[in-house]
Amino acid sequence: LRTAVDCLTLTATPIPRTLQFSLIGARDLSIMNTPPPNRQPIQTEVQVYNEDFIREAIYFETERGGQVFFIYNRIAGLAEMAAIIQGLCPDLSIGFAHGQMDGHLLEERIFDFIDRKYDVLVSTNIVESGVDIPNVNTIIVNNAHQFGLSDLHQLRGRVGRSNKKAFCYLLAPPMSTLPNDSKKRLQTLEQHSELGSGFQIAMRDLDIRGAGNMLGGEQSGFMAEIGFEMYQKILDEAIRELKRTEFKELFKEEIAKQDDFVQDCTIDTDLEILIPDDY
């Protein structure tokens, strides 16, 4: 950290627009790749909803002394989903929690889960941030195709917070029935399950969603006429100029390095370099 930094943003997976600001140089970017000691990668699998599989995954975790998150992101059917899980695992204690519960009741439910009064907590994605329960090492996300990539990565981060092997199961309809974007999101989570993969996931999210509607009809100005590549070049030049004028004290080290390299190269020659007639 430097005293010259006025605002520091910390994120596991930057949203595409924020990431784009860093990639074009409008914001500095630092990546922390070193995980806490003794952490293991979270085994991530995409599965079709199957009650036998759910029962097996829950009992595998509870029999080794752990607990389970079951994510169901519809408040209206949350109690019914908890009843289904209770029917699958009648000898286990099942609780449920969501954001519209009374604050005291919600807090009590979470603390009861931390105190191991429940084996399984059926919850909305309210638990995706700020929850650190090392004994929970299996998370099952129902209808995972309806979640965004960053949401799924945050939910997966609720497990594997100790030295135990953790599991994340993403339940979704068969891949062949899903839209392309949903399919890409699930495949990305399954492929990038190693520690410190948040940046790769964010880059894939940028690739899937784009950095914003740059050339759409809502945009004003002349960008649609000059094209995206020229726009990026003009934007890059404007950022470099600002760094050398208004913010030169902040970026003096970067400017010194840039001065050692040629940014653009112009060749002036008498030779004719044209596309041949027979092309």
Where are these regions (language model features)?
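Post-DEXD/H (motif II) to motif III coupling segment of the RecA-like Helicase ATP-binding lobe
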Residues: L1-Q67
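C-terminal helicase module of SF1/SF2 nucleic-acid helicases/translocases
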Residues: T9, E51-F69, N73, G77-E80, ...
